[in-house]
Regions:
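Extended, low-complexity cationic-aromatic segments
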Residues: 1-87, 199
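Intrinsically disordered, low-complexity and often Lys/Arg-enriched segments
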Residues: 91-92, 98, 121, 204-212
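Active-site proximal helix-loop segment of RNase H-like, two-metal nucleases, encompassing DDE(D)
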Residues: 69, 138, 146-165, 178-183
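Mobile genetic element proteins and their domesticated derivatives, centered on retroelements
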Residues: 20-22, 61, 67, 86, ...
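C-terminal domain-tail junction helix/linker
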Residues: 32, 167-212
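Short, basic/hydrophobic alpha-helical segments
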Residues: 80-101
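Acidic/histidine-rich, metal-coordinating catalytic segments
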Residues: 97-111
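RNase H-like polynucleotidyl transferase catalytic core
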Residues: 44-51, 123-145, 160-164
Length: 212
């Protein structure tokens, strides 16, 4: 936990950008009957029946100090999707960076080994060296600022039925562009000092050192 909190204290550095990465599934649901539009005194209505069209995955890449975010929509959630998104982060979003600091959850797909399972060894090694990973602790996903952005995405864009991955991609891209135009940042205020005080119960108990 303290590792992530110390990283959040770092000042903005374009050569060493700090990004937060998280992902979430989105179930694709299509209406079986056309929804009824709203009229004077009557809200819009949709039938309770719907058709399941599978599940898509959304990867959120958020740079809190710059107010930029990039959302990638994929059909599956595997190591290959994560590695491919991270390659895009390296070579498309931050090609000039010397090192990219990444805060992310400790999922089984979020591993440097994913690069070797997706790319040739030389390319995998190049990508591993592009990143400096800082993992949130178990049950500590709230430390990941990308989770805040995903919550905003759900509230503002995904709180309704979306029938297919094409529509989902279009809706997410429109949300991303608007939010980036507004340069929405996150000012993180929870510090290591706060953690040692307010979350003291999560720390191992100090038993002292005995001199011999």
């Amino acid at each position: 936990m303290e590792d992530v909190l110390e990283v959040y204290k770092l000042p903005y550095d374009a050569h060493r950008p700090l990004i937060c990465m998280d992902e979430m599934p989105k179930q694709l649901l299509a209406d079986k009957q056309e929804p009824l539009p709203c009229q004077a005194g009557t809200p819009a209505r949709e039938d309770y029946e719907y058709k399941r069209n599978g599940v898509a995955d959304l990867f959120m890449v958020f740079e809190p100090l710059a107010g930029k975010r990039f959302v990638e929509v994929t059909e599956k959630r595997r190591k290959i999707e994560w590695a491919t998104v991270m390659k895009q982060v390296s070579d498309v979003f931050y090609p000039q960076a010397e090192k990219i600091l990444v805060v992310l959850d400790n999922l089984n797909t979020h591993s440097p080994s994913a690069f070797y399972e997706t790319f040739e060894p030389e390319e995998a090694r190049r990508l591993v060296e592009r990143f400096e990973f800082h993992f949130t602790p178990k049950h500590g996903s709230w430390l990941n600022m990308a989770e805040i952005e995903l919550s905003a995405l759900v509230r503002q864009c995904l709180d309704r039925r979306i029938p297919d991955i094409q529509t989902l991609t279009q809706e997410v891209q429109a949300w991303q562009e608007q939010r980036n135009d507004e340069v929405v940042k996150v000012l993180w205020q929870f510090t290591t000092t706060d953690a040692r005080t307010k979350l003291k119960h999560l720390y191992p108990k100090f038993s002292g050192v005995t001199d011999y």
